[in-house]
């Protein structure tokens, strides 16, 4: 099941150097204590955390107001722009593609080209990506590019790791 309001435990998967922007790196040392304290505060999902006051987030282990604002920004990092989804109906050829692309477009930076590459490589849903290794995704997409002589680039390792982390968070497949 796809869930953009991910469990708070997903912070441990999402908050690492492999899949976030450098401006969020300073939050990494806080992730374990944050998750532990947020759960104690009965904050179980991203939306629960978004409702917390700045004071509550300080109590959860963040050191100052700047870190609180950075954490709030991090929580919205993987929110999808609804306008991005409008493209799907224009580019999809059938219901199967449309269903697949609705999930794949949840991944950061994914639009038609990357979604089509993942689709052709057999990664049709976030659950497929969540249980895959970066090496498997890179190898399969590279194979499709070669086989179909596509003028596309293989996804970068960091991009694939980000997609795997987000897919795991959104499907509750929390493998660290």
Model-derived segments and spans:
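C-terminal extensions
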Residues: 1-176
């Amino acid at each position: 099941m796809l869930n953009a309001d991910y469990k708070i435990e997903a912070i441990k998967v999402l908050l690492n150097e492999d899949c976030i922007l450098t401006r969020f790196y300073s939050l990494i040392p806080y992730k374990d204590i944050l998750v532990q304290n947020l759960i104690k505060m009965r904050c179980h999902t991203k939306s629960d955390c978004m409702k917390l006051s700045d004071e509550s987030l300080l109590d959860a282990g963040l050191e100052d107001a700047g870190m609180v604002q950075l954490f709030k920004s991090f929580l919205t990092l993987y929110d999808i722009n609804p306008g991005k989804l409008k493209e799907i109906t224009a580019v999809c050829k059938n219901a199967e593609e449309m269903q697949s692309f609705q999930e794949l477009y949840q991944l950061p930076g994914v639009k038609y080209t990357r979604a089509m590459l993942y689709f052709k490589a057999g990664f049709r849903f976030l659950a497929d990506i969540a249980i895959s290794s970066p090496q498997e995704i890179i190898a399969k997409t590279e194979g499709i590019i070669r086989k179909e002589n596509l003028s596309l680039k293989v996804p970068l390792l960091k991009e694939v790791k980000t997609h795997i982390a987000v897919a795991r968070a959104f499907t509750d497949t929390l493998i660290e």
